[in-house]
């Protein structure tokens, strides 16, 4: 019923339309509250991970921001970019399962220790797989160390088997990691980080993602968040 004829002949909007609009407004408010709650929860989880790994404090937040900026440069819509930023906040959640002495070791990891560290991608999936996110967050987290030629981990996926969000997180992760201090080495700088992704464009890293990242930083003057 779209309209209601009043007894005096005046056409007025039907009550059901008013009710529908009110319901839509209430739903929109609820969705915003839910999004805020989810962001707060993911931030808390990210903080918990970084408490165990102080050398990468802020790493997840920065990766999320970089990934979102790259996605925006690629033409992704705002909601999808925001979701990717949130995924960045928890992309290393699986490090909870890695012994702290490995996370903070001041020298390079042994082969055995490296295998334990690599387990964080699968552990992240296992932690998040039953959470009803509106996107395949757990799968994206599991794939953020996969590489286009199949040389990544944990599944050895290649090409289109890797979800677009994971491809962007992979590049954002490399750019942030190489530009930041680590227990076993000083920061190598943005120039070296860009060289890494450009030299391996199409082999390890998605070419479209690399092109967008390079343009964002070298042409648009994007500065990595501190």
Task: Give the residues covered by each predicted segment.
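A broad, low-amplitude sensor of folded, mature protein cores
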Residues: 9, 20-23, 194, 218
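Metal-dependent catalytic cores of enzymes that make or break cyclic nucleotides
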Residues: 30-32, 39-226
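PAS-associated C-terminal cap
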Residues: 15-29
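Output-coupling edge of small sensory domains
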Residues: 1-4, 160
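PAS-family sensory domains
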Residues: 6-16
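General helical structural elements
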Residues: 5, 24-25, 56, 171
């Amino acid at each position: 019923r779209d309209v209601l004829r009043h007894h005096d002949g005046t056409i007025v909007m039907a009550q059901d339309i008013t009710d529908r609009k009110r319901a839509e407004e209430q739903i929109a408010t609820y969705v915003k509250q839910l999004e805020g709650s989810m962001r707060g929860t993911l931030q808390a989880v990210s903080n918990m991970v970084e408490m165990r790994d102080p050398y990468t404090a802020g790493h997840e937040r920065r990766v999320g921001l970089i990934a979102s900026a790259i996605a925006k440069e690629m033409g992704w819509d705002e909601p999808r970019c925001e979701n990717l930023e949130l995924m960045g906040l928890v992309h290393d959640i699986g490090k909870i399962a890695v012994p702290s002495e490995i996370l903070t070791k001041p020298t390079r990891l042994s082969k055995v220790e490296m295998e334990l560290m690599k387990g964080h991608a699968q552990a992240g999936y296992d932690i998040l797989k039953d959470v009803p996110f509106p996107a395949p967050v757990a799968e994206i987290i599991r794939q953020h160390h996969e590489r286009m030629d199949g040389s990544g981990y944990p599944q050895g996926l290649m090409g289109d088997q890797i979800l677009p969000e994971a491809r962007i997180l992979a590049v954002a992760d490399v750019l942030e990691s190489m530009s930041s201090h680590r227990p076993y080495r000083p920061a190598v700088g943005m120039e070296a980080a860009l060289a890494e992704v450009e030299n391996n464009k199409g082999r390890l890293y998605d070419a479209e993602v690399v092109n967008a990242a390079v343009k964002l930083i070298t042409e648009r003057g994007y500065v990595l968040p501190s």
